[in-house]
């Protein structure tokens, strides 16, 4: 029991430090970045655990393609930004806070034309899978007829 006291002091100090950063101890502070392979695995696990099958397949494909594309990046600033955004994404998926969330306008404005094109392609893939899912469910109603 005596050995736990320094740990409790450190925990209390950490809580005070977080509250000084204006988040009042309610939300965790910035986490250390995970190494790429651990983050990659965490993302795939989060998809498996928290997403419906269709979204999981699309998400897994996208994560794999992005990590493959960034394998040869040498710029530390790009790597840190890449890993930070994917880690925030993992936290949102695990916390289920992504549902219905809109993209941050500031982030969209900072995107390159290529990134906006990728975002558009992703949106189209999601919509396409959604309409395919409607047809497979046997709706046969108006939604199936409109997509033809």
Swiss-Prot record:
Protein role = Plays an essential role in the assembly of succinate dehydrogenase (SDH), an enzyme complex (also referred to as respiratory complex II) that is a component of both the tricarboxylic acid (TCA) cycle and the mitochondrial electron transport chain, and which couples the oxidation of succinate to fumarate with the reduction of ubiquinone (coenzyme Q) to ubiquinol. Promotes maturation of the iron-sulfur protein subunit of the SDH catalytic dimer, protecting it from the deleterious effects of oxidants. May act together with SDHAF1.
Gene encoding the protein: acu-17
Define the transit peptide region by residue numbers: 1-12
Stretches the record annotates as Disordered: 129-148
Cite the CDD domains for this sequence.
Answer: Complex1_LYR_SDHAF3_LYRM10
Q: Which organism is it from?
A: Neurospora crassa (strain ATCC 24698 / 74-OR23-1A / CBS 708.71 / DSM 1257 / FGSC 987)
- Which taxonomic lineage is given here? Eukaryota, Fungi, Dikarya, Ascomycota, Pezizomycotina
Q: Where in the cell is it found?
A: Mitochondrion matrix
This chain belongs to which protein, by name? Succinate dehydrogenase assembly factor 3, mitochondrial
Subunit info here reads:
Interacts with the iron-sulfur protein subunit within the SDH catalytic dimer.
Q: Which family does it belong to?
A: Belongs to the complex I LYR family. SDHAF3 subfamily.
Single GO biological process annotation from the record: mitochondrial respiratory chain complex II assembly
So which domain of life are we looking at? Eukaryota
């Amino acid at each position: 029991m005596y050995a736990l006291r320094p740990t409790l002091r450190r925990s209390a100090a950490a809580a005070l430090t977080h509250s000084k950063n204006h988040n009042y101890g309610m939300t965790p502070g910035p986490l250390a970045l995970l190494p790429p392979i651990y983050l990659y695995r965490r993302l795939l696990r989060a998809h498996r655990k928290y997403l419906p099958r269709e979204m999981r397949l699309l998400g897994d494909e996208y994560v794999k393609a992005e990590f493959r594309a960034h394998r040869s990046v040498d710029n530390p600033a790009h790597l840190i930004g890449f890993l930070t955004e994917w880690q925030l994404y993992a936290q949102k998926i695990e916390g289920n806070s992504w549902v219905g969330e809109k993209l941050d306008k500031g982030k969209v404005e900072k995107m390159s034309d290529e990134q906006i094109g990728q975002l558009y392609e992703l949106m189209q893939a999601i919509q396409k899978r959604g309409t395919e899912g409607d047809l497979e469910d046997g709706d046969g109603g108006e939604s199936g007829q409109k997509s033809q």
